[in-house]
Amino acid sequence: MTKPAKIGVLLANLGTPDSPTPKSISRYLWQFLTDPRVVDLPRCKWYPLLKAIILPLRSKRIAKNYQAIWTEQGSPLLAISRQQKDALQAYLDNQNIDTQVEIAMTYGNPSMQSAVKNLLKNQVERIIVLPLYPQYSSSTTGAVFDAFANALKEERGLLPFDFIHSYHIDENYINALADSIKVRLKSDEFLLFSYHGIPLRYEKMGDYYREHCKQTTIAVVNKLGLTENQWRMTFQSRFGREEWLQPYTDKFLESAAAQNIQKIAVICPGFSVDCLETIEEIDEENRENFLNNGGQSYQYIPALNVEHAHIEMMGKLILEKLT
């Protein structure tokens, strides 16, 4: 009987600086913001602006934010990603599947390049790439695909691989989100679904990210039985001067109390791991924003992180590719 092939699994995410210092953050941001999937401006205009103004200013400011949330295990994103890796490895081991799970960051470390090398060194015969972005966007999932392809470009013997494009309406994902909300949402709280934004221009060029976000939101709303006046979908973390997907999370929270929304719970379904954008921007900055503009109470519902239902969902996505 032929022995089943050893499967390599890449848990892919955006990435994180190596340390909470301006120098390390500048190096990370350079890698991130020079990816044309993220910023598609002409290099001759963008690179000088990035080097002379954006990186020096943003690196110092962001360093303070990272320092406030940094842990002994590194950034929250990296620390939780390691826990996810271990939990998924244990889940797959319990299914008697011969696998090796690696973390693969698009930017920073552990890099996609190093993760792929680890798999090849251990002679896996097939690779499954799981970008931890439930909703597809060219600037996230697309960037993972580019990084994966780049990591394999020198390989003469290209291994069979599967690339999980999205899972925005996967039943296990929707159930995990709904269950996470159920145990935390109070009966008198308004529920805000906040997704990371992208430039509106990208949508006009064919990126269907907003539609995926909408489908996720509607599926969860239906699961929870919410009425139209109990929830809203917004977009956060805009960067630069051009128009991004709207409504903007921060602007909505500024005006929420005036719309008679006094108590609010915010969830970020597009984030599989809590990170700077959820911990600092949503749980701190926007909490203050809401409360300072007449709001009474504010709750951030954490990312699914290493909840059992989340790990099981990942495992089932992998198993589906093996059947």
Curated annotation (Swiss-Prot):
Keyword field = Cytoplasm, Heme biosynthesis, Iron, Lyase, Metal-binding, Porphyrin biosynthesis
PROSITE patterns (UniProt xref): FERROCHELATASE
Record's subcellular location: Cytoplasm
Gene3D superfamilies per UniProt: 3.40.50.1400
Name one matching Pfam family: Ferrochelatase
Main localization, broad class: cytoplasm
One GO CC annotation: cytoplasm
- Which reactions does this protein catalyse? heme b + 2 H(+) = protoporphyrin IX + Fe(2+)
Q: What is its EC number?
A: 4.98.1.1
The region annotated as signal peptide is none
Q: Name one GO biological process term.
A: heme biosynthetic process
What positions belong to coiled-coil segments?
Answer: none
Top-rank lineage group of the source organism: Bacteria
Gene Ontology MF term list: ferrochelatase activity; metal ion binding
Q: In which pathway does it act?
A: Porphyrin-containing compound metabolism; protoheme biosynthesis; protoheme from protoporphyrin-IX: step 1/1
Q: What protein does this entry describe? A: Ferrochelatase
